[in-house]
Amino acid sequence: MRFSSALTYSSLAVLGLGLPLALRNTLLNEFLTVLLQNLPDINEDLNDGTTIITDLDTVLGKITGATTTYNDLDSGSCAEYTLIFARGTAEPGNFGVLVGPPFVWALQDIVGTDGLTIQGVNDYSASVAGYLAGGDADGSANMASLINQAHSSCPDTKVIASGYSQGCQIVHNAIGQLDADTASWISKVVLFGDPDNGTALDNVDSANVLTYCNTDDNICVNGDLILPAHLIYAKNVVTAATFATS
């Protein structure tokens, strides 16, 4: 299942009227508003673009108070749902800002705070070099290990494996490192701005995979340009959360 939409910087004011700003989740409302207010008119290569992403994440994090590191699974938490998330290139913590925290808020709006174990991918530098290599090897191995940990420690949880940008490469790589039984046990996979868009996930039913790729997102064709369309996947987290908990 794939969603796409043509988005350009010049259309953002119009898009803002259509974004889900009337949701009950005030954190998500605030985040989307701040994102639109601070979204850069960007058309940069990876090295320059990631610097801008880091600056944008800093602004969004300070204004919204978004949590950038989660280690619930490592702390022994077993909830009904477990989100294991890999952040995008140049993002902070183990969870990032642009997609990870908004996705958490949308999920918690459905299952409550007690219904969700939240875990970011560790040992993952989220560097440009990692993206160009097809996804950081250490981060990929850590995500595979986290999924295996959830499978053994919390067999009744419903795992949502998710990532943004290079984080999607991490998801693809990690699932490829799992045995067939563990991979097929994953409840849902949700990918935002996937450089490997169109590549099947080993031993995961395609009906359980949802990919968001904006038409104007060069990263979704494994490119090396950062454009505004790559920075606004927070607008999709409500429908993503509905899918992930279905």
Which sequence ranges carry the predicted segments?
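Active-site nucleophile loop of the alpha/beta-hydrolase fold
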Residues: 188-198, 214-216
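Active-site catalytic motif of lipid deacylating hydrolases and related acyltransferases
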Residues: 23-156, 214-235, 241-244
